Amino acid sequence: QRATGARVHLMRLSSAAGVALVRAARREGLPLTCDVAAHQIHLTDVDIGFFDSRFRLDPPLRGQRDRDAIVAGLADDTIDAICSDHRPVGDTGKLLPFAEAEAGASGLELLLSLTLKWAQRERVPLARALALVTSAPAAILRAATA
């Protein structure tokens, strides 16, 4: 990116390290945008329980520290958008031992409810929460085509 000046969009941030790298790149003035999947705002590796394959995702669920960093990144505008990460997997792909199960989950129908739940919990204004799933992704796409 430094050599070409190309815009970069990082999809589905899931770790504190990823949020920190975005902050560092922005301090350098690099043209960078990023998003996070709605489920990463709410779930952690603890939710996997005893290797529940329904929670086999890519990127994987991480620890509480990572989830807290993602929430902080949304609060301070480090993270530009919230996405659904909609990658449904049928029973044949999920009803397997955790290590063999396909990564993915149906996310489209949960995007709005999870975003609004986060906004209520964190006292985020409704307009801001809705922008993160509507106008912010649209702006990222427009910038990518400019």
Model-derived regions, located:
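Histidine/acidic residue-rich metal-binding segments in metalloenzymes
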Residues: 1-82
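His/Asp/Glu-enriched, well-ordered alpha-helical/loop segment
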Residues: 2-5, 54, 81, 87-146
